[in-house]
Amino acid sequence: MNPPKSAPDAQGLSYRDAGVDIDAGDALIDKIKPFAKKTLRDGVLGGIGGFGALFEVPKKYREPVLVSGTDGVGTKLKLAFHLNKHDTVGQDLVAMSVNDILVQGAEPLFFLDYFACGKLDVDTAATVVKGIAHGCELSGCALIGGETAEMPGMYPDGEYDLAGFAVGAVEKSKIIDGSTIGAGDVVLGLASSGIHSNGFSLVRKIIERANPDLSADFHGRSLADTLMAPTRIYVKPLLALMQKLTVKGMAHITGGGLVENIPRVLREGLTAELDQNAWPLPPLFKWLQEHGGVADAEMHRVFNCGIGMAVIVAAADADAAIADLTAAGEQVWKIGTVRASREGEAQTVVV
């Protein structure tokens, strides 16, 4: 069969003509290999660039259960585009997934990322992946693979989207599922580093209304840097705590805030009563509430309000847990207690 004839003056088309630059993709791989190499740990059986990534479950596990999580960064990326600040969203991406699998007692083992854009900017993508690798280092997990998708016409110039995938392992007998939580247990709150990666659609609406100078000083750093502070990763201090005492339950405070995430680990019939005066509301959340006219109840169901992770322990273990986490560099408060629910009551109430 003869190929179709083209017009005499027609030029042959290339993938680059269609908007996809294979050379740019290759250049990105070369740039990110050193970042990924720094995250290598026992169990990694291959390098970046293969069709699939190989990982051997550590032999220390007798009955390993794999725990997986996936997430993105949400509309925090829109603020990153506006500020042309791409160095922190990679850590956000890792944190959202590794903190999620941590609450079941899992040690993060490896991470993969997906970077999608309309036109690939190698420097921007490399900056993002460098942040992802940093997040993996903070989590003790390996960055073993990923996908960069350049899709002309799918995203505006200068914009991209991210997705991350984490896999960890926990000993079957040590899975944390909240089943042992009972009345009298104590809820500890670990400080967040800021807004983390949830609620940014409301944040952006408040910024639109208030029209602040994002470069202005805000309690020692620019408002922009305060808003973009990367999500805190709690993996290492909490894995260490689990080796010393019984952690009955944990809740990563993400979308839905304190009042919708803590109930996810409570059995029916139990309520966590939180004292909103037990920890300080950070200045950034006060600023958001003031400039947005946001009600207290809405703040508690949208933002973390200064608490990025809730940890539930027996009352007898609370002081030891606080001391251990404080020594590891965390700010911790007793923010509430678990009790029997009253009729018709929500499973988490803030008083």
Curated annotation (Swiss-Prot):
One cellular component (GO) term of this entry: cytosol
Alphabetic keyword roster: ATP-binding, Cytoplasm, Ligase, Nucleotide-binding, Purine biosynthesis
Gene3D superfamilies linked: PurM-like C-terminal domain, PurM-like, N-terminal domain
InterPro entries per record: PurM-like_C_dom, PurM-like_C_sf, PurM-like_N, PurM-like_N_sf, PurM_cligase
Catalytic activity: 2-formamido-N(1)-(5-O-phospho-beta-D-ribosyl)acetamidine + ATP = 5-amino-1-(5-phospho-beta-D-ribosyl)imidazole + ADP + phosphate + H(+)
HAMAP family in UniProt: AIRS
PANTHER family in alphabetical order: TRIFUNCTIONAL PURINE BIOSYNTHETIC PROTEIN ADENOSINE-3, TRIFUNCTIONAL PURINE BIOSYNTHETIC PROTEIN ADENOSINE-3-RELATED
UniProt similarity note: Belongs to the AIR synthase family.
Protein name: Phosphoribosylformylglycinamidine cyclo-ligase
Organism, as annotated: Burkholderia vietnamiensis (strain G4 / LMG 22486)
Highest classification ranks of the organism: Bacteria, Pseudomonadati, Pseudomonadota, Betaproteobacteria, Burkholderiales
Encoding gene, per UniProt annotation: purM
